[in-house]
Swiss-Prot record:
Keywords from the UniProt entry: Ribonucleoprotein, Ribosomal protein
A GO molecular-function annotation: tRNA binding
Coiled coil: none
Organism of origin: Neisseria gonorrhoeae (strain NCCP11945)
Quaternary structure and partners: Part of the 30S ribosomal subunit.
Name of the protein this chain belongs to: Small ribosomal subunit protein uS10
Length: 103
């Protein structure tokens, strides 16, 4: 489509899974003749939590946990209807959140 692009944003806790799925999207889009910009790694969001180890006492003894959310961004320009059909047929792995916007 003229002057439109598809922006895909991927979110996952496992960086290997998100990279593998991003590569699959790039290969599928290029196979249909579209131009792909990315995947661009965005800053990793790190959430840290402190919880008490003991249920009753020992406030100084704590467990530190963190969750890392990895993000990837890619733009598909010069796409066709074949590109959208091929992207819709991709199997989405469990653990990857996908946001798709047509701009």
């Amino acid at each position: 489509m003229a002057n439109q692009k598809i922006r895909i944003r991927l979110k996952a806790y496992d960086y290997a899974l998100i990279d593998r799925f991003a590569q699959e999207i790039v290969e599928t889009a290029k196979r249909t003749g579209a131009v792909v910009k990315g995947p661009i790694p965005l800053p990793t969001k790190i959430e840290r939590f402190n919880i008490l180890r003991s249920p009753h006492m020992n406030k100084t003894s704590r467990e530190q946990l963190e969750i890392r959310t990895h993000l990837r961004l890619m733009d598909i320009v010069d796409w066709t209807d074949k590109t959208t059909d091929a992207l819709m047929k991709l199997d989405l792995p469990a653990g990857v959140d996908v946001e798709i916007k047509v701009q």
